[in-house]
UniProtKB/Swiss-Prot annotation:
It comes from the Bacteria. It comes from Oleidesulfovibrio alaskensis (strain ATCC BAA-1058 / DSM 17464 / G20). Its main location: cytoplasm. This is Protein-L-isoaspartate O-methyltransferase. GO terms for cellular component: cytoplasm.
Length: 213
C-alpha cells in the first residue's frame, strides 16, 4: 500500500517545483487532493507518477505536471468563473476548485461524467457544476467565462469557446493538425483582439465534437 501523503509530497517536489511550477495555489491544491481516488483501483499505485493513466472509455487522466502547468499559466484567482472542456476523471476540476474558482465542466461521455460528478461530491466539491454535452459547444447559458481550459486536443480553437471567453479572458488549449501530437496554446482576449503564447508540444486525447475532430 502506498503512503499517499508522502507520494503527493514527492510528486510536488520532484515533478512540479523541480520543473518550474511556482504558483502557491497550484502546489497547495495538488499537495492536498487525493489523486489516487481519481484513477482505477488497479492503477492507484501509479497515481503519483509522472505519466498519464487510462480512466476508461479510451480517455486518460493527464500527468501531474501537465495539470499543474495548465493551471499555473491560466493565472486563476479566487472567484473567477472557469469552464473546463473534458471533465474526464474530475481531477483537473478539483484542482481549479481548490484554487478558488467557480468551476463549470463539460464531458461528452456519460459514464465518465456520472463517475466524476459522484466522486467530486463525495470529496466535498459539490459546488462544481457538471454537464453532459458536446464540449466544443461550451456552456452558452453560463457564459461568459474568465478562463477556459480544454483538456483534449483538436484541429483548432472551437469558435463557440472563443465567443464564450470573457474580455479580458484567457484560454488554455492543445491544438494540432495531428491527433497524436499538439502544441499547448494560451489564448488571450483583450479589447476584442486575440493573442497567443505557445507552451510547446503536448499529447492529449482527441477533442471530439461539432467543432473538434
Amino acid at each position: 500500500m502506498i503512503d499517499k501523503r508522502r507520494s503527493r509530497e514527492r510528486m510536488v517536489r520532484e515533478q512540479l517545483t523541480a520543473r518550474g511550477i511556482t504558483d502557491p495555489a497550484v502546489l497547495a491544491a495538488m499537495r492536498k487532493i487525493p489523486r489516487h481516488l481519481f484513477v482505477q483501483e488497479a492503477l492507484q499505485a501509479q497515481a503519483y507518477e509522472d505519466h498519464p493513466l487510462p480512466i476508461g472509455y479510451g480517455q486518460t487522466i493527464s500527468q501531474p505536471f501537465i495539470v499543474a502547468l495548465m493551471s499555473q499559466i491560466l493565472r486563476v484567482t479566487p472567484g473567477m468563473r472557469v469552464l473546463e472542456i473534458g471533465t474526464g476523471s474530475g481531477y483537473q476540476a478539483a484542482v481549479l476548485a481548490e484554487m478558488g474558482a467557480e468551476v463549470y465542466t463539460v464531458e461528452r461521455i456519460a459514464g465518465l461524467q456520472a463517475h466524476a460528478r459522484g466522486l467530486l461530491r463525495r470529496l466535498g466539491y459539490a459546488r462544481i457544476r457538471t454537464k453532459l454535452d458536446d464540449g466544443t459547444m461550451g456552456w452558452p447559458l453560463a457564459a461568459p467565462f474568465d478562463r477556459i481550459i480544454v483538456t483534449a486536443g483538436g484541429p483548432g480553437i472551437p469558435e463557440p469557446l472563443a465567443e464564450q471567453l470573457a474580455d479580458p479572458g484567457t484560454m488554455a488549449i492543445p491544438v494540432g493538425a495531428s491527433r497524436r501530437e499538439q502544441e499547448l496554446y494560451l489564448m488571450h482576449k483583450n479589447d476584442g483582439a486575440l493573442s497567443y503564447e505557445n507552451y510547446g508540444k503536448v499529447a492529449f486525447v482527441d477533442l471530439v465534437g461539432n467543432h473538434g475532430w
